[in-house]
Design a protein with these regions (language model features):
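Short, structured surface patches at the beginning of a domain
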Residues: 1-137
Length: 137
């Protein structure tokens, strides 16, 4: 089976606010397993333990540096909430990915549907049209 973006170097990112480390480790292991199943080239990984209420997260910053530096052209996460539950933070992260021609891939949800439900899909469609950018999915 051919998966989209298999030709792009992939960054795997996980985040959990659960106090048990095993939850975070299991989430990353699931991403690694899924990346292998889809035959993605993993350029790197990062994790954050704690809330997604801020952009000031070491693992998130590592991922963004990798994208900005061209090391990764796609980011694999379990679902959109692993980036943040806050729509304003989600928009900043997705705009960053869009500005750097990178895409976000979710393993356990339909990203476009999640964005639609959160009322964010139209923003990125409009932004892509106005700025001549690709969609970040």
């Amino acid at each position: 089976m051919n998966f989209p973006y298999a030709d792009r170097p992939m960054w795997l990112y996980s985040r959990s606010s659960d106090k048990h480390l095993r939850v975070l480790f299991q989430q990353m292991q699931n991403l690694l397993d899924e990346a292998e199943r889809r035959e993605y080239t993993v350029a790197g990984t990062s994790q954050d333990m704690g809330s997604g209420k801020s952009m000031a997260r070491m693992g998130l910053k590592q991922m963004m540096r990798a994208v900005k530096g061209g090391l990764a052209q796609a980011v694999l996460v379990q679902n959109l909430t692993r980036l943040s539950h806050d729509p304003a933070i989600l928009m900043k992260i997705l705009e960053f990915l869009q500005d750097h021609n990178a895409v976000l891939i979710t393993t356990e949800s339909d990203l476009q549907y999640e964005l639609y439900i959160k009322g964010l899909e139209k923003h990125f469609l409009r932004r892509a049209s106005q700025k001549g950018l690709r969609l970040p999915w």
